[in-house]
From Swiss-Prot:
GO terms for cellular component: mitochondrion. PANTHER family: ELONGATION FACTOR TS, ELONGATION FACTOR TS, MITOCHONDRIAL. This is Elongation factor Ts, mitochondrial. Its main location: mitochondrion. NCBIfam families: tsf. It is found in: Mitochondrion. Pfam families: EF_TS. HAMAP family: EF_Ts (MF_00050).
Length: 379
């Protein structure tokens, strides 16, 4: 009996060792197979591909990596990874396809938020409006990077002799653009870049409009941006060109005053450069309003005519840049500021063109740029 029990224990021991060795061999083989299916060289770079079930920790790591790469919502990131068997490179491509389709569905939604971006040098400036649906997305670094890149693109596209040129999205949409941002395609078109960002942020994103300004060899371009998340961006922009007659003029003083006038334009909202450039329709419309108001006074026709002319001067002070009270010193007006500057630099200084733009203006009525306040007939 004792012998039988000992023999049984020996046999069981042999069986246990055999099974253990077989299990180790299988485990080693499975590990090697998993390694081969997990690390596949591609163009000299090892890409992680999973041929077997992925652990929870590995899943979370892949979700985190793809989220960092794309800024896409977590649910979309996970869905693409699951669809692509946790292959992160394939999932990134799938995510982009999903995003483009989603962006197309959202393209009809109202996008009245966003940013203005300016790019400029001493003689030229370009400003673009990039819209989105919420101010939250307008604070997104990818959105801001795209807005800045589009302004630089517009500046580079500006032709010689174009002192003032409005443009729509069609000017830039098909142009190639090189984006140096880790979350965006490096080389693409402007339209594809806008669509890619729309897919990334989950909102309707669109390039709405832009303007280009330039000056002569003896002038300067100045700008001011209100509510700036970073330099060259904001919700309201003022730009102005100042022209001088003498090439020896000290332009530093002209630039300084130009920046102040650009800030004035943002604050005072002028519609026209000078009284002579007030459109006939605007002038007649204002006269009609003033006549109606004067008639209720019960005064004589002569008295009412004087009343209308007096109130018309007040209208000019409200909407004509040269007649407006200077926001930095309301005891003088812009015309006097320019006269004083001309004396200081020894050369006559005049305003060539100006622009005031605000994010979302006019969008509720029309997508055209009718909400833009520009330099009347000075265009």
């Amino acid at each position: 009996m004792a012998w039988g029990q000992g023999a049984k224990r020996s046999i069981l021991g042999l069986l246990f060792r055999s099974q253990h060795q077989t299990a180790r061999a299988y485990s080693s083989s499975a590990f090697q197979t998993h390694q081969l299916s997990t690390h596949v060289p591609q163009d000299g770079v090892f890409i992680r591909r999973f041929g077997s079930e992925v652990s929870s920790s590995e899943q979370m790591n892949l979700i985190k990596q793809l989220r960092q790469r794309t800024s896409a919502p977590i649910k979309d990131v996970k869905a693409s990874l699951v669809t692509c068997n946790w292959d992160i490179e394939a999932a990134q491509k799938d995510l982009r396809k999903r995003g483009v389709a989603l962006a197309a569905k959202k393209s009809s939604r109202t996008a009245a938020e966003g940013l203005l971006a300016i790019a400029q040098d001493d003689k030229r400036a370009a400003v673009v409006e990039l819209n989105c649906e919420t101010d939250f997305v307008a604070r997104n670094d990818v959105f801001q990077y795209l807005a800045s890149s589009l302004a630089k693109m517009a500046l580079s596209a500006q032709g010689p002799g174009e002192l003032f040129m409005p443009f729509g999205p069609e000017l830039l949409e098909n142009m190639p653009i090189n984006l140096d941002h880790p979350k965006l395609s490096v080389e693409t078109t402007v339209q594809s870049a806008v669509t890619e960002v729309a897919a990334m942020v989950g909102e309707n994103v669109k390039l709405r409009r832009g303007f280009m300004l330039s000056t002569t060899a003896h002038g300067v371009v100045s700008s001011y941006m209100h509510t700036c998340p970073q330099p060259g961006m904001g919700r309201i922009a003022g730009l102005v060109t100042l022209e001088t007659e003498d090439s020896s003029t000290l332009l530093d003083s002209v630039k300084s005053v130009g920046s102040s006038i650009a800030m004035h334009i943002v604050a005072a909202k002028p519609l026209f450069l000078s009284k002579e450039l007030v459109s006939a329709s605007a002038l007649e419309n204002e006269r009609e309003i003033l006549r109606t108001q004067a008639q209720s006074s019960g005064k004589s026709q002569m008295a009412m005519d004087k009343m209308v002319e007096g109130r018309l001067r007040k209208y000019f002070e409200e909407v004509v840049l040269m007649e407006q009270k200077y926001v930095l010193n309301d005891s003088t007006n812009i015309k006097t500021v320019l006269n004083d500057l001309s004396k200081e630099v020894g050369s006559k200084v005049t305003i060539g063109n100006f622009i005031r733009m605000e994010v979302g203006e006019g969008i509720e009525r029309t997508e055209a740029a009718d909400g833009l306040e520009v330099a009347g007939g000075a265009m």
